């Protein structure tokens, strides 16, 4: 671990604080990949329902290198990661698209897949620091005001090389005390928690589960959820999907609380996981099997609860890459081919759905629910804006399942650039990161 606390950095930090004071946590910040509550739901109003390169573009900046991470937004700062001149890097912009700082770190480890890069993992912030993670194993804490390095470490140098067949996809998550990274791969797999301020290792929990070949590999991001004392849960709980299992851990020490297996009953050796779990009230929702299944797990219990806590399973619907969004007891699922369904979290039954026009481009970005609408973005940079169903009767939908109403399309957005990052919605603005650009979309000032 390297501490960046030189006098020069200290002077820079003092100057930066004078110009930039972190704001308290607000619902209209977007601190991590899946938003303030890690559920794909954004706050705010006044978002546009259509855009193009010549319509509703507040600004667009060309990035100096490639990346696939989703921006983190806090107050006036927008942070993205990318590669710059062979280095892992991060850039901080203000809300007007002006570059405020850029920070180069260690040597970049290039991506293998045409959709991916060595900078796939999304940054996470608390408004004071921003933590960035890369395929190279580099994990760093930066000052969000000026990009000054607070500390750095490298997981692969500490714990062993990456054995994933493809490019790192998991993003770091924050608990009250730690920044946590999940490493799930063929061979040694683990969760590691580092002190947010100093970078010291707080705990490391092995996560070695019986899964064949590529099925042992996961690109998903854990979910941090407030524990329910009535269910015997700790104050903070970590939910992790990968290696044919969902596991829940005490975020204070990494110890496993419960596990559910059986997600790969036939032992398929290529069932790697990409989409992440999401928590819907009393249920953990786990998309799996390369987009073929969704499993709902009741929270609570101890040990192996596979036989007792699976609430329902859908084998006719799933999401391979996009992670579902959750709101008001409903789950919004977007498949890689643009089939979108809204499910009742308690029963798994479809309440309303739509199948977007077929296209050779897939959906990798995850859906976002905001201001009475849903935004889904295709890899060619085309987004569909749908009306979020505000009034649905689950029983009526079940009784008339062959005559379900479709989700209404409100508008389309186009940027004509490769897009796998998830849209970020903050304070009436949509920040869309493509492979080599950052767009800000909204009504003109």
Language-model features, listed with the residues they occupy:
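Bacterial N-terminal signal peptides
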Residues: 8-21
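Noncatalytic, solvent-exposed loop/strand surfaces
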Residues: 23-445
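Intrinsic disorder/low-complexity segments
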Residues: 3-4, 17-18, 434
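N-terminal secretory signal peptides that target proteins for export/translocation
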Residues: 1-9
């Amino acid at each position: 671990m390297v501490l960046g606390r030189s006098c020069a950095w200290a002077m820079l930090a003092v100057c930066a604080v004078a110009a930039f004071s972190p704001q308290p946590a607000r619902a209209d910040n977007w601190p991590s990949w899946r938003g303030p509550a890690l559920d794909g739901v954004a706050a705010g109003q006044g978002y546009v329902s259509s855009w193009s390169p010549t319509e509703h573009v507040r600004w667009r900046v060309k990035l100096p290198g490639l990346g696939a991470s989703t921006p983190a937004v806090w107050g006036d700062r927008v942070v993205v990661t990318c590669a710059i001149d062979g280095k892992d890097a991060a850039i901080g912009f203000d809300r007007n698209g002006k570059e405020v700082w850029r920070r180069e770190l260690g040597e970049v480890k290039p991506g293998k897949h045409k959709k991916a890069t060595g900078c796939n993992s999304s940054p996470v912030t608390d408004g004071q620091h921003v933590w960035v993670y890369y395929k190279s194993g580099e994990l760093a804490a930066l000052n969000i005001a000026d990009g000054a390095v607070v500390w750095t470490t490298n997981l692969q140098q500490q714990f062993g090389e990456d054995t994933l067949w493809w490019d790192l996809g998991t993003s770091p998550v924050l608990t009250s005390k730690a920044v946590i990274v999940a490493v799930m791969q063929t061979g040694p797999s683990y969760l590691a928690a580092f002190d947010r301020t100093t970078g010291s290792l707080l705990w490391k929990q092995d996560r070695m589960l019986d899964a064949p070949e590529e099925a042992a590999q996961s690109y998903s991001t854990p979910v941090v959820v407030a524990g329910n004392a009535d269910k015997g849960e700790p104050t903070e709980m970590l939910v992790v999907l990968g290696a044919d299992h969902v596991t829940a851990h005490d975020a204070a020490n990494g110890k496993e609380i419960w596990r559910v297996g059986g997600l790969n009953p036939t032992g398929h050796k290529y069932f790697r996981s990409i989409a992440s779990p999401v928590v819907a009230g009393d249920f953990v929702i786990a998309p799996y099997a390369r987009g073929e299944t969704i499993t709902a797990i009741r929270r609570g219990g101890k040990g192996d609860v596979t036989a007792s806590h699976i609430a329902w399973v859908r084998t006719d619907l799933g999401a391979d890459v996009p992670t579902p969004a959750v709101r008001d007891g409903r789950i919004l699922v977007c498949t890689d081919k643009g089939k979108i369904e809204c499910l009742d979290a308690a029963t798994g039954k479809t309440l309303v759905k739509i199948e977007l026009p077929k296209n050779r481009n897939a959906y990798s970005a995850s859906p976002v629910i905001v201001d009475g609408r849903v935004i889904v973005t295709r890899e060619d940079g085309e987004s569909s804006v749908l009306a979020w169903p505000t009034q649905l009767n689950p029983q009526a939908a079940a009784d008339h399942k062959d005559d379900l109403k479709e989700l209404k399309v409100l508008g389309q957005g186009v940027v004509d650039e490769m897009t796998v990052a998830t849209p970020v919605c903050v304070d009436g603005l949509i920040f869309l990161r493509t492979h080599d650009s950052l767009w800000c979309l909204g009504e003109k000032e």
